[in-house]
Amino acid sequence: IVLEKDLSKSYEKIDMVTTPDGSPVAMVHCNNCTSDLNAWINLFKEYQELLGIPVDMNEVYGKLYNHALTGNADCGGLISFNYISGEPVTGFADGRPMFVRSANDKFSLANFMRTHLYASVGVLKIGNDILFK
């Protein structure tokens, strides 16, 4: 985010850089974003290929992302930990992606996709919350 003025103090979770003209930029450095989500989408692609269905990745992403909009706001209770690698913003040295749910959660494709989309921007939100306070 290009800043109108310098931050009031230094934040461990925010990297400061500048634009070519020297304007200050605050950047949340996330190690994990869509890598885990992309892995799941590639799994759906592989399934389509096994069925002999032509794969257009733009269509696969579009259909799955739009379908996520029909899921529950709370993702039906499903939880995704998308850490392929460590994440300094949240204090994790190593990554171990996981998808978890309880027997009573609303396990649907829409909720599955929604929770992975939320997870892909979760760390970015933590950093942005610092900037917008």
Regions found by a protein language model. Name each.
Residues I1-K133:
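Active-site core segments that coordinate phosphate-bearing ligands/cofactors
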